[in-house]
């Protein structure tokens, strides 16, 4: 194990031992800030987001963002070991946040510290963010506008160091059908439940005119429904929830408007900020992916990449299938591999640019 990998693992063990659930990450932010300062990286902080720029940062040059997050979900009830006790067993490092996304955070940190003084045709900007797991208002949503122009990004999440070049967006729709109450025995009123059922049937077979070349068709699933107060009263309202996985074929706002026109129910989006992303195959990030032998794919999960209005890909050590699971772990060898691939990828990107 080389010195960089050992440094990364030591930092990860410290982070695991420091609880950092979303919206309560101040202690891990303190640790990361101190670590970067100790290594001469001149860190800055906004809320619990910690960031640092490469030496000789020049706003006139392109900027590559290296982003991961240091918040975690809360531990699952089925843990059989202390989630905050970093434990090494063979090649496995156990602990909450080890895989999602601590391994990516420490691997990107070591990569940044190695390359921050190297002559590259672009700036490096490291941002270890908070509130990713809850898409909170004090995470990347607040930080991004304060970082200046960014041209492209690598987002560190557990992908087995393969490159997720696209993510579907997400819009959750609260839908309400309205009718008129009446006595069920006399067939009175207008049954809001039937209106909702017609709309749900329409959503089940709805097809948009355009389809994304990379992300495929927009996906719609109705996941919740509630109506009625008692058996003999025709319900005058029926509420249901639709989970809509959007693509780059339409903006989230366009998607909502198309569905509004198709339904009788009132449609209210909870948010439209989780946008789809799709990396053009000709972009330097995509070319570096191919040149370094990384497989590309479309990710089924969302991340802070959804908030980024510039080309980006998601790539990091670990496996997505371990995220949010009891007895979470990452392989030490995955961290070593991750640092090496990040460095190789950035150097290849420099050659392309």
Could you describe each region identified by the protein language model?
Residues 32, 105-115, 143, 196-199, ...:
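Buried hydrophobic packing segments
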